[in-house]
Amino acid sequence: MKLLLDTTYLLPAIGISVKNVPKDAPIKLLRKGHTIFMSDISIFELSANGAKYVATGKLPAERVTRGIRAIVYNETIEKIPIHDTTLLLTAFKLRSLLSDFIDCLILSAAIDKCDALITEDQDIQNLKENKEFKGLLSSANPSFKIQTLKESL
């Protein structure tokens, strides 16, 4: 399956651990035979999160930059640009359903290019039962799924 990973699963690469998320989640998914994608906006999110940790002295800047470089240059993770017209138009539609536009961009990238979005985000998970969201999927990607990591492994 083509899976787009929410930024949460990439945070361990820059030195930020996330409760109940294994630091090797991308590797586990690759070993299961999945193709891994990420939105380019996740690089911004990783940088912003990393900056908070660097500013408070919890992480050295080099740890964050090394992790970001490792992700950017990792050829097993396919990157999806955020400037694609179709992706943006879908993100604009999603904005009425989600308050966080970064989440809209990530979800839109997944809908456009992948079989599923892997996320623990409750606001996104709640869309699975949303009538308007189901209508959007019926024309954009009818077989698309929103899953947690546990559901994907």
Predicted regions and their residues:
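Short amphipathic alpha-helical interaction patches enriched in hydrophobic/aromatic residues
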Residues: 11, 50-54, 75, 95, ...
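Short, well-structured N-terminal submotif of metal-dependent ribonuclease cores
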Residues: 1-41, 53-66
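Short, conserved catalytic or adaptor-binding loops enriched in Gly and charged residues
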Residues: 26-31, 69-73, 135-141
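Helix-adjacent hinge/juxtasegments
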Residues: 56-83
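Amphipathic alpha-helical repeat scaffolds of TPR domains
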Residues: 44-48
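Short, flexible helix/strand-to-coil boundary loops that buttress conserved ligand/catalytic motifs
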Residues: 14-15, 50, 128-129
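Active-site neighborhoods of divalent-metal-dependent phosphate/nucleic-acid chemistry enzymes
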Residues: 76-122, 126
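Acidic, PIN/NYN-like endoribonuclease modules and their adjacent C-terminal/linker elements
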Residues: 80, 111, 115-153
